[in-house]
Amino acid sequence: MAINFKRIATTIFGLAGIAAVIYGVGVTWDLHRTYTSTAQDSDAPDDAQLARGRYVAYSADCAACHTAPGAAPFAGGYPLATPFGKILSSNITSDKDTGIGSWTLAQFDRAVRHGQGSHGYLYPAMPYTSYARMTDADVRDLWAYVHSLAPVNHRVVEDQLPFPYSQRWLLGGWNLLFFRAQPFRDDSTKSVEYNRGAYLVEGAGHCAACHTAKNFLGGDSAAFLQGGSLAGWYAPDLTANPHVGVGAWSVDDIATYLATGSNEKAVSSGPMTEAIENSTQHLTSADLHAIGVYLKAQRSSSDAPAQPVAATDAAMVLGKRVYESQCIACHVSNGSGIRRMIPAFVNSPTLLSNNPATLLHIVLMGEDGPQTHANPTGAGMPRFDWKLSDDEVAAVLTYTRNSWGNAAPAVSAGTVAQARKQLVSQNWIGH
């Protein structure tokens, strides 16, 4: 019997057309449905509500993404690098023309907790997948505070993505796959402190946005808080893993790090420094300790120490020579650094991570230390892109990752070359 290819093709196209119509109807319904919320607009928020809203804004780290370098606070334009292209953050001041001054609380809630803005679906670079867990009260207070911000007329062309990622309607399918708008619920088997930490980490703090690996579509993997790549950096493991996570840290260590940008074991860098300066340093001691309690209770990831690279290995020999000529003055001979200022290398989760991306950033382009209320003049790390070859950078990182009792995979010159090329293309370092 002859195969009727025309009939098969007609059937396939017909089914595809029906699926497209169903999807279009679903997207239209989703973008126009009403969400249930007890939050109500307040015509005249009092000082107490504005203070609560400011605190929620700190906990949600709103300023970090909605403030471009050197620009007015919350006026948008901050470039957010994603695997799919660049997105510019929106203006969330009360300007009615270019900001959200004409919005209602319901529209604000729809954007923050449901990922739907005035132009359709929001990209999940806006962490509505986490903010969905925020309470009605926190959203109401946050709205009161944001609505009180001085208007800044600053029009932002947010969409910078190439086709097909520029098609926002496709995010309806993404949400169907990866987004569950589930409000936070206390775990009755846990303490009040644990639940407060869980609310902050899973909700407003949106820690998983950086510290959980993403799949090829940008959805969260199942490896919750076990580390993830972020615009060329690596957000480390936050589980109780004693090797690459916070298992060797105390609750006080975690709270101190989030409050000041450093502790006895680490000094922040990159996007984490921004988060500390803009967000966590402003949280109460009780909330920081609650975060620590929650993180310490997370099941350890499976990452185990690697076999140490032998001291006689050629990379170790070269690395020791580079370390003694370039690094020893600050990090000292035994890798202990300077307390609360220069990172110690012994049992450092950042140093021992299987992914050396953060280390490569710091060595090649340098890094300013965190500047917080507790540490107003953070130390700086000079750049070495102009001074050290790919082989030398790889060797000194391999040496520090495998000295003083450390054990981590060797870093290759090829990995350094790739990181250098990326930083050059982004104009972070010269050719």
Regions flagged by a language model, labelled:
Residues 43-75, 79:
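Short extracytoplasmic
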Residues 64, 209, 329:
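Short, cysteine/histidine-rich loop/knuckle motifs that typically chelate Zn2+
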Residues 9-25:
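Hydrophobic membrane-insertion alpha-helices, especially the h-region
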Residues 1-6:
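Short, Lys/Arg-rich N-terminal segment immediately upstream of the first membrane anchor
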Residues 61-64, 81-90, 94-133, 137, ...:
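The feature marks the first
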Residues 251, 258, 262, 346-395:
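Extended, polar beta-sheet/loop recognition surfaces of beta-rich domains
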Residues 28-40, 68-86, 118-198, 202-203, ...:
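Flexible coil segments in periplasmic/lumen-exposed cytochrome c-class electron-transfer proteins
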